[in-house]
């Protein structure tokens, strides 16, 4: 994760050349709400990269911690419509995912600037992303990995039910609550509306992308997600991702570097099947023998007995996909 040293939001208000953007976006948005500066106290930079810059802020009225993502309009590649206004698709996707579900980051508000959008989200504390969590603790034992992985599956299923596909499932986009082991899926900047037809665009993380994208630049959303879940599970139990180079991805060169259970190894191999149609559906992963074992997540401060998943509720039927 790239870090930056910006100390304020001053650069957010600077105008830039907007001639390449749709005319509708240039029109002022008339909304009946307080200006951003009167609602939120600006804090420090949390992270910065191609996605934009994320600030650690707080709400003035009650001191609630928030994260504010600054996205320059010139960097937005996918647009959507919200109440008749063109906005980054990321905002539309976050709006589509109801806030009642705890496993996905909650959108609180958004603002439009002449040259950028500000996306205001909840900022849970104390947390660290799963990448840092694994870096600090090393490979996870299978009970912990199972509990975490199940929560990721729940988040993905919830997104599917809302018509959203994340398209960038990875350890850096999962926040771990260090008090109770709860996970939250973040960063929908690479996401899309869920569809059954082929996608021909991808802005996620290369080493988590499926071989059909690397080879043919086309993929189906559900089967590509299952591939990334396989990479994630491998990362959890081995402490590192299985592939670094494109050749390793398209040849599915898996190296099991230490002893893990046969069931876990089999699930990883299934998710990382070369042919998309050979991969399991999300519900088949839930029903896999390795997933059905009793699990106990060990967090930094306490042991959390994860809730039992009702596999019969909120299920999404997925047909086999092939290119």
Swiss-Prot record:
Presence of the UniProt keyword Signal in the record: no
Domain named Protein kinase: residues: 40-291
Modified residues annotated as Phosphoserine in this record: 4, 190
Record gene name: pim3
Subcellular localization, as worded in the UniProt entry: Cytoplasm
InterPro entries referenced in this protein's UniProt entry, alphabetically: Kinase-like_dom_sf (IPR011009), PIM1/2/3 (IPR017348), PIM_Ser/Thr_kinase (IPR051138), Prot_kinase_dom (IPR000719), Ser/Thr_kinase_AS (IPR008271)
Active site positions, chain numbering: 168 (proton acceptor)
GO molecular function term, any single one: protein serine kinase activity
Modified sites of kind Phosphothreonine: 205
Protein modification: Autophosphorylated.
Domain of life: Eukaryota
Family classification: Belongs to the protein kinase superfamily. CAMK Ser/Thr protein kinase family. PIM subfamily.
Chain sites annotated for binding ATP: 46-54, 69
Catalytic activities: L-seryl-[protein] + ATP = O-phospho-L-seryl-[protein] + ADP + H(+); L-threonyl-[protein] + ATP = O-phospho-L-threonyl-[protein] + ADP + H(+)
Function: Proto-oncogene with serine/threonine kinase activity that can prevent apoptosis and promote cell survival and protein translation.
Protein's name in the database: Serine/threonine-protein kinase pim-3
Taxonomic source organism: Xenopus laevis
GO terms, biological process: apoptotic process; negative regulation of apoptotic process; regulation of mitotic cell cycle
A GO CC term assigned to this protein in UniProt: cytoplasm
Record flagged with keyword ATP-binding: yes
Keywords tagged on the record: Apoptosis, ATP-binding, Cytoplasm, Kinase, Nucleotide-binding, Phosphoprotein, Proto-oncogene, Serine/threonine-protein kinase, Transferase
Entry EC number(s): 2.7.11.1
Xref: Pfam families: Pkinase
Main subcellular location of this protein, as a coarse class: cytoplasm
